[in-house]
Amino acid sequence: MKVKINEVHSVFAWSWHIPSTSDEDAANNDPIGNDEDEDVCGICRASYNGTCPSCKFPGDQCPLVIGLCHHNFHDHCIYRWLDTPTSKGLCPMCRQTFQLQKGLAINDAHVQKFVEIVSRRREEMIEEGVAEEFVDFDEPIRQNTDNPIGRQQVDTILDEDFLLR
């Protein structure tokens, strides 16, 4: 018996490797237990493995970024969000200061673009005279002298200094 192959059609699938955010997730590396609702961009609600509304094709042209607060977004979505006056430099999901998580290969290519957008937005707000509303990206951890514990992470929404400005 002889077999002649006329055509070959390759089929493949890919997905982003998003580092787990907790020790429990790392210990339980079972993809069956993952919640599908968590695999969407918090801004455009499109799948991470799909594209944002700005892109036509998934992959390197529509990459992800991971915030220090462990929220993930398409890079086009978060940059467009951070460039709006209402964002005030905060994560759209948890309203903490949005910063790229350091030490992740997925974020390395976006650091310079992130710094440029934040700097440009800060300069625009200074010109408009509303720079005090912009959250300082350089100091996400503040010294709390009333607390005997000392340095602590401050939730930006509940920070009294922020509310009084």
From Swiss-Prot:
Keywords: Cell cycle, Cell division, Ligase, Metal-binding, Mitosis, Ubl conjugation pathway, Zinc, Zinc-finger. One of its GO terms (molecular function) is cullin family protein binding. It comes from the Eukaryota. Changing residue 41 to A: Loss of function. Pfam families: zf-ANAPC11. One of its GO terms (cellular component) is anaphase-promoting complex. InterPro entries: RING-box_E3_Ubiquitin_Ligase, RING-H2_APC11, Znf_RING, Znf_RING/FYVE/PHD. A zinc finger (RING-type) spans 52-95. The APC/C is composed of at least 13 subunits that stay tightly associated throughout the cell cycle: APC1, APC2, APC4, APC5, APC9, APC11, CDC16, CDC23, CDC26, CDC27, DOC1, MND2 and SWM1. This is Anaphase-promoting complex subunit 11. It comes from Saccharomyces cerevisiae (strain ATCC 204508 / S288c) (Baker's yeast). The gene is APC11.
